[in-house]
Regions:
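Anion-binding alpha/beta catalytic cores of soluble intermediary-metabolism enzymes, centered on
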Residues: 1-143
């Protein structure tokens, strides 16, 4: 609320839900609201990943048969487009097949947010294929 006031942002059309101070209980409340159709998107904020993911992957949470992945969207003051990074948090060592699933999840999420015509970069530590660096081999296979 302080940030909204400082930035002179109107919260008139925003419902603020008071949640418990316990991050896991707050996440459970958010997951329940998604299941009820009251929320369309979960935002992580400053929660620890395990506090967020526990209620999501619980059998009564939001788990589906699809791979769960993470999408981080951000703006740079000196760049004209929104940028996204996936999956830097949930899937620790994905193979090329799993990376394709993660990419598909991200593209679907962006489309739901109204972001179409997405450009994708498969990033590794170097821009050339290195047979000793699996991420470069995967990038070549995905592209």
């Amino acid at each position: 609320l302080e940030l909204a006031a400082t930035e002179e942002l109107s919260l008139d059309d925003i419902e603020i839900v008071d949640t418990p101070k316990d991050p896991i209980l707050a996440t459970k409340k958010a997951v329940e609201m998604v299941k009820q159709g009251k929320l369309a998107v979960l935002m992580k904020g400053s929660l620890h990943t395990e506090d967020l993911m526990g209620p999501i992957v619980h059998r009564d949470g939001l788990r589906t048969d699809k791979r769960i992945s993470h999408l981080f969207l951000f703006e740079l003051a000196r760049y004209h487009k929104l940028l996204g990074v996936t999956d830097a948090v949930v899937n620790i060592a994905p193979d090329a097949k799993l990376k394709r699933e993660i990419l598909a999840n991200s593209l679907a999420a962006l489309k739901k947010l109204g972001i179409n015509n997405t450009k994708v970069a498969i990033i590794a530590a170097t821009e050339v294929i290195n047979p000793t660096m699996q991420s470069t081999i995967d990038a070549k296979e995905i592209v």
